[in-house]
Amino acid sequence: MFLLLRFVLVSCIIGSLGFDNPPTNVVSHLNGDWFLFGDSRSDCNHVVNTNPRNYSYMDLNPALCDSGKISSKAGNSIFRSFHFTDFYNYTGEGQQIIFYEGLNFTPYHAFKCTTSGSNDIWMQNKGLFYTQVYKNMAVYRSLTFVNVPYVYNGSAQSTALCKSGSLVLNNPAYIAREANFGDYYYKVEADFYLSGCDEYIVPLCIFNGKFLSNTKYYDDSQYYFNKDTGVIYGLNSTETITTGFDFNCHYLVLPSGNYLAISNELLLTVPTKAICLNKRKDFTPVQVVDSRWNNARQSDNMTAVACQPPYCYFRNSTTNYVGVYDINHGDAGFTSILSGLLYDSPCFSQQGVFRYDNVSSVWPLYSYGRCPTAADINTPDVPICVYDPLPLILLGILLGVAVIIIVVLLLYFMVDNGTRLHDA
């Protein structure tokens, strides 16, 4: 009890002397078991191949280039590689996962499947995709891409129906209509297989609206059927709109198995790529750094929408992105955020990263790691310390049990001694 009171007193004295230990706006790690996924702002290979080699192009400290803990590609993102022919095989593994990518698919690219489509739907898809990625990488160590083999018994081939600018959708694949079908009112199937990973993130997408072809309107209908378990996953078009709709995607987390892709109307779609999730781990929140352009280009907030506690911590700069290499590369604020990767930190929270694990001026919310157990609330004259009550409650219970044991032992020996005297 004396030690506890001394700890409380010392902590309050430290607080009164101004030891704030505030949360810092960085991404960091508990130890060396971490990994970063990124784009050009952390792509060391891209900088090496430029002439001259100018590391001001990156927000990442070049001291980390040889760490072996980075998977980044200039001009790309995990979402872009997942859906489109512009592909990079993001691959990495760690207990603590950090993401700093996403701006290579934003409203600036204005992607939509058809001329009457909607980029807003694709921003919605982006948010749903990253929600699944962040949630699952809080419980899995390893992320990579795998191809999904499929077998379609018809003669029709996949078609590039959904494209805009340089972006061509190839996941899921569209199977063209068979030549002997006069319209799109038909049912068609394809087998696909998932193997080699613990779980997979795969797309299930439909045109949610009335799709017009040759004066006829069609309602999209797509299903995946797990032939091993009998579980079926499906989407049907529910909107009556004829313009301004686009390819709505849901992102399913599926186990290994044999599947059947089924279309009851319009074109059959079948997944061709999947995020491969491997090696379950203890729950560890991921960290996400906002990925946005200079204000001269339009960005979105979908990674922020997807990154929610307790599974994700979001870090952002309070100012416009203004790079020193060019306006979109080498920003001081984001370089500062990534500087936390140069050192270990004991505690992570929604507010930021704590450098020390004793006392803080801010109580950590959604904390992870070895976090401060006390927050000092400074009044003008007297520091008042507020502590996490759980350790005190447990200590009180242990002290109470110890007192009871001592009393029982004393009574036992007193009775035993009295019995011996009586016998004598």
Swiss-Prot record:
Effect of N49T: In strain: Isolate BCQ.376, Isolate BCQ.701, Isolate BCQ.1523, Isolate BCQ.2442, Isolate BCQ.2508, Isolate BCQ.3708, Isolate BCQ.3994 and Isolate BCQ.7373
Topology in membrane: Single-pass type I membrane protein
Subunit structure, as described in the record: Homodimer; disulfide-linked. Forms a complex with the M protein in the pre-Golgi. Associates then with S-M complex to form a ternary complex S-M-HE.
Subcellular location: Virion membrane; Host cell membrane
Resulting phenotype, R53P: In strain: Isolate BCQ.2590
PTM section of the record: N-glycosylated in the RER. N-glycosylated in the host RER.
Positions of glycan attachment: N54, N89, N153, N236, N301, N316, N358, N417
Source superkingdom: Viruses
Region annotation (Esterase domain 1) ranges: 7-127
Effect of L392I: In strain: Isolate BCQ.3, Isolate BCQ.376, Isolate BCQ.571, Isolate BCQ.701, Isolate BCQ.1523, Isolate BCQ.2439, Isolate BCQ.2442, Isolate BCQ.2508, Isolate BCQ.3708, Isolate BCQ.3994 and Isolate BCQ.7373
GO biological process, one term: fusion of virus membrane with host plasma membrane
Protein name: Hemagglutinin-esterase
GO cellular component, one term: virion membrane
SUPFAM superfamilies in the cross-refs: SGNH hydrolase, Viral protein domain
UniProt topological domain (Virion surface) ranges: 17-392
Active-site residue numbers: S40, D326, H329
Keyword Phosphoprotein in annotation: no
Phenotype upon changing L103V: In strain: Isolate BCQ.3, Isolate BCQ.376, Isolate BCQ.701, Isolate BCQ.1523, Isolate BCQ.2442, Isolate BCQ.2508, Isolate BCQ.2590, Isolate BCQ.3708, Isolate BCQ.3994 and Isolate BCQ.7373
MF terms (GO), sorted A to Z: host cell surface receptor binding; sialate 4-O-acetylesterase activity; sialate 9-O-acetylesterase activity; sialate O-acetylesterase activity
Residue span of region Receptor binding: 128-266
Effect of L103I: In strain: Isolate BCQ.2439
Family under the similarity heading: Belongs to the influenza type C/coronaviruses hemagglutinin-esterase family.
